[in-house]
Amino acid sequence: AGGSITTNSIVNAFNNVIANANGNIATNGDVTAETGKAVLNSKSGSVTMQNVAGNSEVDIDAANNITANGSLTSTNANVDLNAGGSITTNSTVNANNNVIANANGDINTKGDVTATNGNAVLNSKGGSVNTQNVTAGQAVDIDAANNITANDSLTSTNANVDLNAGGSITTNGQVTAQKNVDYNAKGSITTGGIINSTTGNINLQTDAAQGDIIFGGDVTAEHGNINIDVLQNGNVTDDDNKFTALGDKGDINSGNFALHIKGAGDVDLHEIYTTNNAFIDVDNGNLTLAKINGDLVALRLHTEGKQMKVDELIAGTKIIAQSSDINIDKIQQRLDADGLLTIVPDSAQPNKPIDNLNIGEIITNKGVRFDHLWLNNGSINVSEGIFNIDKLVVNNVAHFSNKHMKTAVWGAPPQRDDSDSIYWNNIAVNNPANNLAEWQQEGIKPYKWMYLHFAEQPNIQYSNGILLYLRNYYYVYNQHYSAVDYMLYQLNENKAEEYDINYAPGIVQYFRYDLYDLDEDDNKSEPVKITVEA
């Protein structure tokens, strides 16, 4: 028709139903193509319809808007919707193969969309996309120039769920895919239900001046990785949810979690579990975690003054913690881990000391080794296993303990406390900032810095630190005497002859255990008497 087409009753055809108009098309009754296709094409107007069903394609094109007040069904083929304006479907859209909707304006699917064996593709070039349930045998692919809002579930049975928005993305229901789940937003991302991938990765990314990511449900990659990226600024938070990335042990392609905020933003998450590695890297923000569990766990905050707070950290082989303020209530080693747990702590800037480091409890299978530790103030308690610090610099004071022995290390003028051993380290020499390469290499060599090793045996340490005090029946090797021992010895009544005792010919052993010094005066007829008091 050169103008508009309006049908006020049912339109049935054994083969095809085809309507072409330069104006509007309005079908106020059902349209059915029993063995063929249903085609409604308005070259310069809009298309409004009730139920439309075709045995093969259902193809609707409009220069302006498409409004479906009834269901759209393709029994054996595709449902294709193309609009120069907006698309609104007020009931279900079902296709045996693909459901494809392209619009320059908004797309609103107020009923469920199902592409049984194909793809569900919703693409708004100039507006937003709002959906209910969207299910596809293959990919669910939704793109919007502005925002995407999924008010119910998004499901890909055999492929991917891919969401790309020029604005924000909100998914209020479950998002599940056999393979990958991808969120890419130029605004924020908000999830209200679980996100699950069976054999692929889960990727969420924002690129906005304030691109927050807020999780309202658990996130699980059954055999894949979880990647969260804030390319500019934004917070990453959840509502007491759990992130789980499972996979083959040692596989970089599965079982890993990675979160990176490249600008300003805080991370506040409840629980993270990975088969392999868990990485969190924040350029300018705080980190708060209730629980994180990975074979290797790396937590990095790159701005001075930001705080790292972790209630429970479980790791198999290694922990990297970087922040100027680190507070970890409990560290535990995975039960199946073999060997010492290695902890590598650094400040936000590696050429500066950690301002505060507090670890309430460390429980390991065999022991824990700190590769290096440079701090102003701190406290570390190890409940089980060996406790070794290979390189140690303390600018003010720090306390270290296991279940047998408590130690204080001072860089500031030392004070007596209830510690079993007290050390002082001279911070005026060998500043780690002057030789970061040697400071960061593994092991105690080149012996420029203090080391402190708690032995497995009770009440025994090994250290080259300056020992100020050692409680009776406690031992530090290879040191026999503390500064307090020397000061007490100076009070001995024979100290006036200290030089003769230690340096006179024939008396070469230092510290003679109070042996007397014979007077060589030949005029004395009687030998010196020795009095021993019990």
Label every PLM stretch briefly:
Residues 3-6, 11-13, 17-18, 23-27, ...:
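Extracellular beta-strand scaffolds
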Residues 70, 369, 379-381, 388, ...:
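Binding/recognition "hotspot" determinant
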